[in-house]
């Protein structure tokens, strides 16, 4: 396919003349006849799901094509594909959501089928229809089913007509704000506002009273439009103690439909799942059978084939389940189902797309053991789980095995940008029963190493270790109801003292380990090598007892309350051990360190030996040091006091973030993002709690409110402007 042809296609597409593109693709010699099997798949997605689809395709001997934006040029999914095509700038609207551009990529590479993954175009009936009209195989359900189920209002009307129980609500076409507010009052507060299209919790708002309705409704519309291109909304009665249980269904083109049991996705933050499991705990076999049958009936009602998920909300007080929505795609959490049924669902998708019947009947679908999935995100947990951006300076996932999977789309050195979802990886584990699987989950979380961006790993460890989670007492408000256990409480002196004691122990381990590294580093530098990142202190006298002081600033990663300086005396003893002195009449700690790798150590203290790992990188004039041992992970930093070689510093992440102090009353950005809307003017009088501006990052909106009453001063931003985390937005003058 010549570049002249591509340009001609683009010209016609821009004139909204899609017919030429359809005719071109349909007539291409590379398009497969219907009786042939798929030989080349274009994956219209990015990140971990693109890598996961390609893995199965390659196992089946199918060639793969990746698409990428400028931000993803060097991403893992691009490297994993046989071919890759650039589709536009970083903005998802101009790249991964551009169906016509993706169709051009398919024509250019001779792909016979398109797998949409999840998100982006996966639930676009228009895109599925374009594939069908163009002679391409869309690896997913028919466009008609996506259309019926993609509109949540329409899907609820269909399910209601089919006798599936529904939560009371409004699913009509009238979207006038006054009409919607009137409907909300009829339903009765609290209510939940949901976009009629899309998923992932985007655009969802819980409204407790009428006074909050207008702001929530308009915010939901904006977020829905930004994420899905459609801003229509539905309203539902908000069930106060619900469980979120979904059923994996599968159909083929021969009329067969079955379910592969259920998943519990109740543990959520910001209306997004973070730990999923299969099967759901604490339900009866009768409940499971009824739920599965309801899901199959829902799929049959719309002539469904390929992979889909029917989501139900379960009232924990009555044990009644209600249809919530149907996701017409492969779900993020599909691996937990794969683990308990022993099947590759992407392979099923491809075979169904080829016209093959389902490989099993309902009675043949096995269920073995229990599986968990934990989603590892780049996010600031102390800041309300706000998404974070930055470089993965250190990335060491756990080792995979038949019972442990790591689904990821990143490598060490990659950047987590503001343009896409901040997920780093999915950790999936299997055990013979729920207890065994939970033990494995906690162990793997303890050994999953990420440094360079804040993550939710520590929070996931707390969730997995909670006594109520251990017995399966889960519901969607689990985090809110147990926040005193899950979040650090600075007002509890005993808990604070225990936490700080653990930090000081980690600091002692860091001091001993970096002293060990510095011995070898000094020897290397004496032979003409430039000091590495680890060298920051004078060398010890090797054959005599010597002492140095190491100062570490502790970044309080739990509470996000700043740094604490820890000063340690490190005494090198003739027998090769270290004596760590913390001062303040604290007892000394004797440590013996054996180097087990570049940054891995075996440390013995008081007859107890343990594995310790360190990672370090340069950022903002500091050496940042992370330590992992047992279930502990802490981070420290040291002011860099020597010059490093250009090569040494060149590979480290450097930012231009603001480090100077701000005038009193200055409000700074809680995250990097795009200013969507500025709601007031400079010098305007505002009340405490009044919304001032709206930020968007990773398609999620965050409203910045006035912390106190006063007048707005030094308003520095406008709509459409990008801001960095911690940059000044405005000032409140009382």
Swiss-Prot record:
Every ATP-grasp domain range: 156-354
Positions with a binding annotation for Mn(2+) 2: 325, 327
GO biological process, one term: L-leucine catabolic process
Pathway(s) per entry: Amino-acid degradation; L-leucine degradation; (S)-3-hydroxy-3-methylglutaryl-CoA from 3-isovaleryl-CoA: step 2/3
Domain Biotinyl-binding: 657-733
Catalytic site positions: 329
Predominant localisation class: mitochondrion
PANTHER family: CARBOXYLASE:PYRUVATE/ACETYL-COA/PROPIONYL-COA CARBOXYLASE, METHYLCROTONOYL-COA CARBOXYLASE SUBUNIT ALPHA, MITOCHONDRIAL-RELATED
UniProt name for this protein: Methylcrotonoyl-CoA carboxylase subunit alpha, mitochondrial
Source organism (scientific name): Arabidopsis thaliana
